[in-house]
Amino acid sequence: MIKDMQPFLQQAWEKAGFKELTEIQKQAIPTILEGQDVIAESPTGTGKTLAYLLPLLHKINPEVKQPQVVVLAPTRELVMQIHEEVQKFTAGTEISGASLIGGADIKRQVEKLKKHPRVIVGSPGRILELIRMKKLKMHEVKTIVFDEFDQIVKQKMMGAVQDVIKSTMRDRQLVFFSATMTKAAEDAARDLAVEPQLVRVTRAESKSLVEHTYIICERREKNDYVRRIMHMGDVKAVAFLNDPFRLDEITEKLKFRKMKAAALHAEASKQEREATMRAFRGGKLEILLATDIAARGIDIDDLTHVIHLELPDTVDQYIHRSGRTGRMGKEGTVVSLVTPQEERKLLQFAKKLGIVFTKQEMFKGSFVETKPKAPKKKKPAFTGKKKPR
């Protein structure tokens, strides 16, 4: 399939070191190339971004100096990650992209549009604002992609989404992607799309090389287990908590134990978040602590471990957290630190997901699978009779 694409895409694919398409890419690329509307669901880390970018970049006409593809995403971080992929796969060509996010200087964004980007990646609100200012022309847009569409629906961005769609020609293609396509999101997508093709890839089909493990410990022991995991060597981890007010407390305790740790806060400024992520990607930090909201949109290629310091409330949260390791066919480890009372909830997650969770202990700096204790032999009941000699 890659061999049938534009030479610049083949070269970028080889340069990125990819060997074969993931399951979502195999299923979605032909349908998108045909121009059909698509609703796609695939776990985090399975190559969803390239599943839509590759066919759409292949179809772009560089001679038409207007936006031809628009990608809408719910968070600043996700917008920037998608934009980076566009830059990587169009390097050395006439095709360029522009990222348009809320909160950034709109005058600079208008200047970006004067350079004739063929691919626009942005937040629904800011893109709609530029359309209304008549700075972003949509008449040549052939495809609109909605990445993490469940979050777009959840964050009540549908008004902006509908207005952006209305600004394009009627024959445009709509593509909806999500790691967890909720019923509400799927219903909303079906209302907007025309005879959409449904592409759904399960965790089992995605050939994940992620190992899901758990350790039973008391709540007070969890920080020490994080320390022991980090000392296993060459570990780069994100640890998740539910309570944002505990982020700094736990981070300071880990730093006191000589770990290069930092907290990622949802309310941190763009500059603070970017500085933290730069330090983490550059190896100055070995572990990030975050909540689900704070970690939204984070994408780190070489993340070795995801640690659930606190078990998430839902299966969907578990999927989103855990999908940050083992991306694009790489190996990864997910460790849940659970109290004896939490074990039952975790095993319910395992049953719903169809995943085998390995119960482990730590011994001499390594994971060791917990062996079930042999049942004690019952002593024969005393009958009062003496054994015959």
UniProtKB/Swiss-Prot annotation:
Positions of the Helicase ATP-binding domain: 29-199
Gene Ontology CC: one annotated term: cytosol
Enzyme Commission code: 3.6.4.13
Ranges annotated as spanning the membrane: none
Root EC class: hydrolase
Listed GO biological process terms: response to cold
GO MF, one annotated term: ATP binding
Compositional bias (Basic residues): 373-389
Pfam families: DEAD, Helicase_C
Catalysis performed (reactions): ATP + H2O = ADP + phosphate + H(+)
Motif segment (Q motif): 1-26
Sorted UniProt keywords: ATP-binding, Helicase, Hydrolase, Nucleotide-binding, Stress response
InterPro entries attached to this UniProt entry: DEAD/DEAH_box_helicase_dom, DEAD_box_RNA_helicases, Helicase_ATP-bd, Helicase_C-like, P-loop_NTPase
Region span, Disordered: 368-389
Short motif (DEAD box): ranges: 147-150
Entry binding sites for ATP: 42-49
Induction of synthesis: Induced at 10 degrees Celsius.
General function of this protein: DEAD-box RNA helicase. Probably has an RNA-dependent ATPase activity and a 3' to 5' RNA helicase activity that uses the energy of ATP hydrolysis to destabilize and unwind short RNA duplexes.
Listed name of the protein: DEAD-box ATP-dependent RNA helicase CshC
